[in-house]
Amino acid sequence: MRTNDLLADLERGDAAALARAISMVENQREGFEKLLAELHKKVGVRPTHRIGITGPPGAGKSTLTEQLVRAYRERGLKVAVIAVDPTSPFTGGALLGDRIRMESVSLDPGVFIRSMATRGAQGGLATTTEEVADVLEAFGFDRILIETVGVGQTELDVAATAETTVLVLVPESGDGIQTLKAGVMEIAELYVINKSDRPGADKLRQEIEVMLGIRKGNAFVNVRPHHGPTAAKRSGGAGEGRRDPAAAKDSWEAPVLMTVATKGQGIAELVATLDRHHDFLQSSGKLEERRRRRLAARTRAVLNRAIRQWVLDETEAEDLLARRLDDVAAGTRSPYDVAAEVLNKVRNGK
């Protein structure tokens, strides 16, 4: 199908065309860049909220995502879910599965669910995910939920493409909180302790709040025995932090919420907090700041992808690379020597 025809079908709201467009972007088929360039004109026009949902396996992210979908649909919002499963670089096997637990919401015409496994897509998984999110936003979705299967660097890069990142933990995560702290904990705007009816939930909440207090330069945050403070509660009130109220308007203090997704507990508060964070991003100007940073990073990623493809499309350069890889493996050449030789071949034909 020609790109112009596909764009026309998307304009008409054809769901089948949406699926084809996403496949085109995922697999970088001919015309995908033209498609994205045209759809880019519609990105940022409507108040779409991109929400990243990440956390260790077994935290109940899919169930939590399903509950969010239900809550948003009750408000009449169109919801898309991108379930990101990075592919094993060794076997090429993806951990996909069709998210069977979401079958009940997938039948809703106002819901679109897509599992992604890119098998080493050029330009990186995060770039591809963001491009797919652009297609969904241009199609008219109000909420785009980006769910990852774990907390590795790839998943964190994907989650970082969202405007709001939710880190989902379970009471059993408490033992590993110190290791999580180094990378995962820093990316979240909102922490959710799911399965909070299990022992250890309150203790984990306290540990997270103490960690957040230390990060903000206040090691003596008040710890509350209820279902997690809101951003407003934690930044205001006597004795609850010593921050300038004026400065608080331009900053967001990540709340810790408690949920039991299988029972729907805490979902209303989670939805309200997500809305509040999006409002904060808009009113503070940080949404535009993030958008500009993301677009700058994306432009560089797209340029890198184009350069890489340009090099590999040069048949002689590709043949030279294939021959020199044996030399690298044998230890007679270094990767740097070979890269320089291939680039010289592309530039000068020598």
Question: Where do the model's predicted regions map?
Answer:
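Short beta-strand/turn micro-motifs at beta-sheet edges
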Residues: 100-101, 176-181, 241-247
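Flexible active-site lid/hinge loop adjacent to a nucleotide/diphosphate
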Residues: 171-199
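Alpha-helical scaffold elements adjacent to nucleotide-binding pockets in ATP/GTP-utilizing enzyme cores
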Residues: 95, 131-132, 157, 161, ...
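Short, basic, low-complexity termini and linkers enriched in Ser/Thr/Gly/Pro
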Residues: 242-243, 348-350
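Canonical P-loop GTPase G-domain recognition
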Residues: 190-279
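Nucleotide-state-sensitive switch-loop elements of NTP-binding domains
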Residues: 2-59, 65-154, 161-176
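Glycine/charge-rich, flexible interdomain linkers and switch-proximal surface loops
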Residues: 36-57, 65, 87, 153, ...
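Long, well-ordered amphipathic alpha-helical subdomains in the mid-to-C-terminal portions
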Residues: 250, 257-261, 265-347
